Amino acid sequence: MDNQFIFQYSWEILPKKWVHKMKRSEHGNRFYTNTDYLFPLLCFLKWHTYTRVQVLIDICGVDYPSRKRRFEVVYNLLSTRYNSRIRVQTSADEVTRISSVVSLFPSAGWWEREVWDMFGVSFINHPDLRRILTDYGFEGHPLRKDFPLSGYVEVRYDDPEKRVVSEPIEMTQEFRYFDFASPWEQRSDG
């Protein structure tokens, strides 16, 4: 059974409201879904006879500030039985919460915590949603495109006081404008 069969079969059997777009490539299949249907879609992919996705490779976050639903959450899956890779993608905004898939894939706990910590995308029913890579007192989410490069505070070791201190960063520049347009997508003069 190959990727083409899995793609065709999934397209025919899945409810159309679960998947609003699918793409097939030699490296695997891509399913685009709404956050409301993410959990049922992943249940189908894990338990159905012709998909049998048993491995959650990772969960990634991507920030597209120009989009209305600016965050894209990508689930990279592997079916060892059929030697097939499947990528499930969904989009969310700052307030949309995504269903946690820890009950399906226990390893998702770490990945969901990372996506929440770095991007601020929240997961419903996550057993332990707290920061994993940044400090507990950290403000903001550092992989968002609108997060300042310098951060908000400076953390350093103060030798005379013999302790770590946090101080607000003093910037002479009050406002910075970020141009999110890609230079490759602009019109050419030729």
Curated annotation (Swiss-Prot):
GO CC terms in record? mitochondrial inner membrane; mitochondrion; respiratory chain complex I
What interactions and quaternary structure are annotated? Complex I is composed of about 45 different subunits. This is a component of the iron-sulfur (IP) fragment of the enzyme.
For the keyword Membrane, the answer is yes
User: What are the EC numbers?
Assistant: 7.1.1.2
Q: Where in or outside the cell?
A: Mitochondrion inner membrane
Function according to Swiss-Prot or TrEMBL: Core subunit of the mitochondrial membrane respiratory chain NADH dehydrogenase (Complex I) that is believed to belong to the minimal assembly required for catalysis. Complex I functions in the transfer of electrons from NADH to the respiratory chain. The immediate electron acceptor for the enzyme is believed to be ubiquinone.
Ranges annotated as spanning the membrane? none
In alphabetical order, the GO MF annotations are: NADH dehydrogenase (ubiquinone) activity
Q: Which reaction does it catalyse?
A: a ubiquinone + NADH + 5 H(+)(in) = a ubiquinol + NAD(+) + 4 H(+)(out)
Q: Which PROSITE patterns match?
A: COMPLEX1_30K (PS00542)
Location (main, coarse) = mitochondrion
What sort of enzyme, by top EC class, is this? translocase
Q: What is this protein called?
A: NADH dehydrogenase [ubiquinone] iron-sulfur protein 3
* Family of the protein in this entry: Belongs to the complex I 30 kDa subunit family.
Q: Which keywords, in A-to-Z order, does the entry hold?
A: Electron transport, Membrane, Mitochondrion, Mitochondrion inner membrane, NAD, Oxidoreductase, Respiratory chain, Translocase, Transport, Ubiquinone
- This protein's gene is called NAD9
Q: Which Pfam families match?
A: Complex1_30kDa (PF00329)
